[in-house]
């Protein structure tokens, strides 16, 4: 099996429940959405990646030698991300997905981090609502927000009784993190506020971090 891969690198997890943990990132090329705030434009098209076999991906991941893996994109579910995770069965694998594609059953070593696209993304209508029912307590659902309307959307989804752990992140330059904190506290919302650690440590536009 051949994949289109933008990059494979080792860094620390920049967000979610493993934040700060050393991790190998496998970034697959190609995405079916065009979010307004996308920070990985260089991975939107299939042509942005190079061809790698499953065996080559596994070998490079082992060479980089971290205890966990994040498979991201682009949109990794456009390629067979599950087969990569199965081939890396001795690693805990986080598959980051944009929420528009029906999620397949996951192997034991996988958890999903699924976006729920709010209004500022321009991609809300692309969401596959049934995915909300498939996520479990080990999964993460991420809301990237830019204004009060986005926060209201996030609250509405969270209050449906989802099982996944909800995280709310700011769109940089549109909303201050403290505004999100105030909203979560004022609304007694069962959610975690986060900023992207890698954008604090490095330049927000730097790749391979």
Where are the model-predicted features located?
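Short N-terminal binding/cap micro-motifs at the start of the first secondary-structure element
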Residues: 12-17, 34, 202
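Short secondary-structure boundary/capping segments within folded domains
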Residues: 14-18, 30, 185
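Conserved Radical SAM active-site core
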Residues: 3, 7-10, 22-23, 29, ...
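Short, functional N-terminal and low-complexity linear motifs
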Residues: 3, 23-29, 119-124, 151
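A generic structural micro-feature
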Residues: 18-20, 135
């Amino acid at each position: 099996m051949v994949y289109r891969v933008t990059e494979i690198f080792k860094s620390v997890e920049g967000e979610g429940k493993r934040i700060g943990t050393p991790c190998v990132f496998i970034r697959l090329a190609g995405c079916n959405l065009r979010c307004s705030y996308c920070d990985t434009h260089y991975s939107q098209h299939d042509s942005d990646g190079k061809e790698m076999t499953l065996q080559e991906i596994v070998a490079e991941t082992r060479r980089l030698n971290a205890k966990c893996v994040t498979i991201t994109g682009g949109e990794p579910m456009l390629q067979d991300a599950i087969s990569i995770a199965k081939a890396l069965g001795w690693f805990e694998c986080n598959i980051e997905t944009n929420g528009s594609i029906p999620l397949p059953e996951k192997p034991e070593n996988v958890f999903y981090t699924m976006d729920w696209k709010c209004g500022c993304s321009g991609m809300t209508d692309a969401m596959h609502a049934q995915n909300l029912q498939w996520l479990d307590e080990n999964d993460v659902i991420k809301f990237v927000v830019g204004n009060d309307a986005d926060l209201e959307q996030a609250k509405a989804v969270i209050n449906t009784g989802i099982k996944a752990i909800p995280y709310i992140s700011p769109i940089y330059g549109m909303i201050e993190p403290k505004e999100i904190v105030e909203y979560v506290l004022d609304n007694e919302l069962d959610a975690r506020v986060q900023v992207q650690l890698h954008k604090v440590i490095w330049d927000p536009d730097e790749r391979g971090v």
